[in-house]
């Protein structure tokens, strides 16, 4: 698919919308030269969570960040239409003529990165997975059954009764309170993104956007040789179970920071990522 491109007059950043399945469009930004590096954001957030990395990484790489479907400036999903975030990521890569890329994901972005390791490792130069793991719950090959639909109906009703604003406030507090000594520095940027989030996902029948078990089966059997760095926060205990299936995997625990480590300790996070990628 051809990307609809525009050039921002005040910078060297290229931005636009990329058509994807179901008539949806994905907002993206691209900056820099060199090997491609793609940033994958977390749930309830958008491309702005990568502000501490985007310009810095673009000094060495061609950096792409985009809003997943249902977030930021990208299209909202259609109930009943099955898609995955991995398929949308591959659409972005194909549209921008990117064959292989370094993939950096945090939280939900890391879930998608692990999906890619299982199903499309040949399109990865390396991978950095922060605050996220390989999911093994039901994937798209197992449609939602009546029991799950009933549970979702109850969840949606409970959220409407509680109020979306209250849910967002609690979600924000959870992310901030998980942090270390610099946690208050992330409150403002997170509050802005979560405030702008439509909360489409918890208010609808969201399709299985993470490949999860479908990808995990392939991940376990393939033992992908892609260089992988797994980063966990100060609350982590023990090594990630995924390491035993990654011949070229490494693990780092970042102290004095929580789930949103890239925002809370950007200098340390940036150094970890850039040192790892440049050594490949």
How would you name each of these model-derived features?
Residues 249-280:
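Catalytic active-site module of serine/aspartate enzymes centered on a nucleophile-bearing elbow/loop
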Residues 195-247:
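Conserved serine/cysteine hydrolase catalytic core
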Residues 31, 52-55, 65-108, 263, ...:
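Active-site loop/oxyanion-hole signature of alpha/beta-hydrolase fold enzymes
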Residues 154-159, 166-182, 204-210, 231:
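Helix-loop "lid/cap" segments that line or gate small-molecule binding pockets
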Residues 1-37, 59-61, 274-280:
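Alpha/beta-hydrolase fold catalytic core
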Residues 21-75:
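Conserved HGGG/HGGXW glycine-rich cap/lid loop of the alpha/beta-hydrolase fold
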Residues 118-119, 124-160:
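Flexible "cap/lid" loop of the alpha/beta hydrolase fold
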Residues 112-116:
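Hydrolases whose catalytic domains are alpha/beta-hydrolase-1, hotdog thioesterase
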